[in-house]
Regions:
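Alpha-helix initiation and N-capping motif
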Residues: 3-4, 22-26, 45, 75, ...
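Broad hydrophobic/π-residue packing in well-ordered secondary structure
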Residues: 1-6, 48, 77, 82, ...
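Basic, alpha-helical nucleic-acid-binding regions used in initiation and control of genome expression
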Residues: 87-92, 96-146
């Protein structure tokens, strides 16, 4: 899996007719990924973490705070919105050319790899074995917060 495929899956497999119910939106993606290998599920997770990490900057946080008071969590969930709106949208957010992003959240995408893995192995998603190399938490991209 690569970034292109990552964004294709989000745009083509998620049920966007269910907008407003994020769990329903991601349900088809969870089912789809659960039919792939663990390596593919983990790759999806790693790509998601990398993309979120790349948006984790002091500049973006300041931009976001112009639109409403962001906490560490809400800033993460707003970064998730950039992912679920496709690659072109993501790149605009990354370049600082789409500030509307900071008024929305899409936390549900974070659970997709864990839910898919749990479904595949008939296990609790809390037993998910991967910890991505890049942290998604706000402030993790230390170089971009200086």
């Amino acid at each position: 899996m690569d970034k292109k495929r990552f964004f294709e899956l989000i745009m083509d497999v998620c049920d966007w007719d269910q907008s407003g119910d994020d769990d329903m939106v991601i349900a088809p993606l969870v089912r789809y990924l659960s039919n792939l290998s663990d390596e593919e599920i983990f790759a999806f997770d790693d790509i998601m973490a990398e993309l979120l990490y790349d948006l984790d900057t002091k500049k973006n946080f300041k931009r976001a705070c112009k639109y409403y008071d962001h906490s560490d969590d809400s800033f993460l969930y707003s970064r998730c919105t950039a992912l679920v709106n496709g690659e072109e949208y993501y790149e605009k957010v990354k370049a600082g050319k789409n500030n509307k992003n900071w008024t929305m959240e899409f936390e549900a995408i974070l659970s997709v790899p864990m839910l898919a893995w749990g479904r595949k192995h008939n296990k609790d998603c809390g037993d998910y074995p991967l910890l991505s190399a890049k942290s998604i938490e706000t402030g993790s991209n230390v170089d971009e917060w200086k």
